[in-house]
């Protein structure tokens, strides 16, 4: 469909926001890149206007075009690339030239499977950067840096993504350790998607006395731990107490923080798979509101984007968001026969608002599933899952399923592929670009059949975090070389921000080395090149988002998203490649992250 141009008012508002915002960077870990720790995320303060022509010169710019061209200069105007090549560049009033001095530049990274809306709704003053820390000292440094812009009495939080395996000590910080870094603000650290959690002294005092209509105080251990006690998950209860105290302005701040973190790791566009919806919302609308039992990955799926959309209307969003619609209703006996199942999905499919929006925010597909996956061994749930595929195909929407298979079985993938073939025979889906997420153990036969249906896959890259070597030596997947050799459009994703971090360089490191977070080989013989990994995260992911004509490569006419890196991703050691960070991120022709490294290199 034809994209709507943002209004002039919103463009001016966004440019002003980007121009006047400020970023504080905290460097840690020696050669580690700067990590942004802002309350009002934007770019490093600057006096120059962002509305003219922007020219990058003297770089190694990997365009990721069809020829894998590497050029030295690129010109950006009005949000698009207007010149890509070598030699002369635009000069004169309104032209800003940035001398890259040989730095590596790549297209903006596109994330094809994330749950970014969760990161954009975190209560408190959130520290997403804790996923980049490698030990407890670095976590504490990040918390202390964040405290500088947190008002008295307000929580500092760090949730999701982080697990003890990411830290050298293989544990979360204790109450005493958190107190040593932040003694005068309550702190709440929440592990993964469902806890446990850890707090400090002020947080302990709050949670042990907190009351609300649906829950009383939390049980907090002497070390600040919130775990499951007598069947009650007190990490989730604590999360509930924070969520119900969030204001709409708090949520807008959280959405800005999430976008700033995304820009700081080089992600310029996300395909959001939303969150696991409450299945009972149709029967009990009150269950959509925050509950003491809700984990981090559950929010009201009708209202979770409200704050982000408000920012977009104000012209203040700066990461491209594509929203999928995840529907999570299995067989519900109270709804009756099959014709009355799936009420939410049926309502969604009455409209044709897929791939609808503008360059910064648009809708996507049904995904990452239309109904919870079920096999024929559960007849009622299988019937509902199969019917959900029929409904999506009949309505002419794009559809996704997320199945990885296992090292010893690809039966679940076979069920998805054979069902897609049945949908094509009945309705015709070849022009809809249906997708398979994860796809770790898709066989050559599966891939050939999916390719014949004009489907694509998005390969998972998160196994490195919790995977351990198998006793039989089999790879944990994905089988990257096999998937890429099939010729099917194959993107790559991290699947943040609960079971894995948001940082894409971790996934690229895993795809190219097979090493887990502890340095163990868990995917033997299944490595791809760095060029292939970057292609999957840029050009291939653009195809997966149905945006290959606008995104994924640095070519004249495409939207101007690029990342200037702090090191040469292609030549540094594997260990250093994993630490890759941007020094400058550009979205829509505007600098949205600036580590300050290039400040002295501007002509």
Predicted regions span which residues?
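N-terminal secretory signal peptides
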Residues: 1-16, 38
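N-terminal export leaders
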Residues: 13-30
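Signal peptide processing junction and immediate N-terminal pro/mature segment
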Residues: 33-45
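Divalent metal-binding segments
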Residues: 46-57, 62, 66-345, 359-405, ...
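Acidic (Asp/Glu)-rich catalytic clusters
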Residues: 312, 349-361, 450-452
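His/Asp/Glu-enriched, well-ordered alpha-helical/loop segment
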Residues: 393-404, 408-434, 438-440, 444-455, ...
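Extracellular/periplasmic ectodomains of large secreted or surface enzymes and adhesion receptors
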Residues: 595-603
């Amino acid at each position: 469909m034809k994209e709507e141009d943002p209004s002039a008012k919103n463009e001016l508002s966004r440019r002003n926001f980007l121009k006047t915002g400020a970023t504080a960077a905290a460097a840690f870990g020696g050669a580690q890149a700067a990590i942004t720790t802002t309350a009002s995320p934007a770019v490093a303060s600057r006096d120059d206007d962002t509305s003219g022509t922007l020219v990058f010169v003297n770089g190694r710019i990997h365009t990721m075009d069809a020829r894998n061209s590497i050029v030295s200069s690129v010109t950006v105007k009005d949000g698009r690339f207007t010149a890509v090549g070598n030699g002369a560049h635009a000069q004169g009033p309104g032209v800003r030239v940035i001398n890259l001095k040989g730095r590596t530049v790549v297209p903006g990274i596109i994330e094809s499977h994330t749950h970014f809306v969760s990161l954009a709704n975190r209560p408190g003053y959130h520290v997403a950067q804790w996923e980049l820390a490698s030990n407890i000292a670095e976590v504490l440094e990040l918390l202390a840096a964040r405290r500088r812009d947190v008002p008295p009495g307000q929580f500092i939080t760090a949730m999701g993504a982080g697990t003890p395996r990411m830290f050298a000590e293989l544990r979360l910080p204790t109450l005493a350790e958190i107190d040593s870094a932040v003694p005068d603000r309550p702190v709440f650290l929440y592990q993964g998607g469902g806890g446990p959690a850890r707090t400090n002294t002020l947080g302990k005092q709050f949670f042990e006395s907190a009351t609300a209509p649906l829950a009383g105080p939390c049980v907090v251990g002497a070390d600040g731990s919130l775990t499951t006690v007598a069947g009650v998950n007190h990490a989730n209860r604590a999360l509930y107490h924070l969520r119900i105290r969030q204001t709409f302005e708090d949520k807008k701040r959280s959405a800005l923080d999430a976008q700033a973190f995304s820009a700081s790791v080089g992600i310029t566009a996300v395909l959001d798979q939303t969150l696991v919806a409450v299945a009972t919302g149709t029967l009990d609308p009150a269950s959509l509101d925050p509950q003491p039992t809700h984990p981090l990955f559950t929010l009201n799926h009708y209202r979770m984007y409200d704050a982000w959309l408000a920012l977009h209307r104000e012209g203040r969003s700066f990461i491209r968001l594509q929203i999928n619609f995840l529907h999570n209703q299995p067989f519900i006996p109270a709804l009756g026969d099959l014709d009355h199942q799936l009420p939410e999905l049926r309502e969604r499919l009455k409209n044709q608002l897929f791939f609808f929006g503008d360059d910064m925010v648009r809708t996507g597909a049904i995904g990452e599933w239309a109904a919870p996956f079920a096999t024929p061994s559960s007849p009622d749930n299988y019937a509902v899952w199969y019917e959900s595929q029929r409904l999506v195909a009949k309505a002419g929407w794009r559809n996704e399923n997320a199945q990885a298979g296992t090292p010893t079985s690809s039966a679940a993938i076979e069920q998805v592929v054979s069902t897609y073939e049945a949908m094509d025979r009945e309705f015709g889906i070849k022009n809809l670009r249906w997708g398979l997420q994860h796809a770790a153990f898709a066989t050559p036969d599966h891939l050939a059949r999916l390719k014949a249906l004009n489907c694509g896959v998005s390969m998972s890259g998160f196994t490195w975090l919790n995977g351990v070597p198998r006793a039989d030596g089999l790879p944990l997947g994905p089988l990257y070389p096999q998937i890429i050799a099939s010729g099917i459009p194959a993107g790559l994703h991290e699947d943040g921000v609960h079971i894995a971090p948001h940082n894409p360089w971790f996934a690229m490191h895993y795809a190219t080395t097979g090493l887990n977070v502890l340095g163990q080989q868990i995917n033997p013989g299944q490595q791809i090149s760095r060029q292939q990994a970057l292609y999957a995260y840029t050009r291939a992911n653009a195809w997966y988002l149905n945006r290959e004509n606008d995104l994924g490569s640095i070519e004249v006419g495409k939207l101007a998203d690029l990342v200037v890196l702090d090191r040469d991703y292609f030549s540094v050691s594997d260990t250093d490649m994993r630490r890759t960070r941007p020094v400058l991120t550009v979205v829509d022709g505007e600098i949205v992250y600036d580590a300050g490294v290039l400040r002295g290199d501007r002509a």
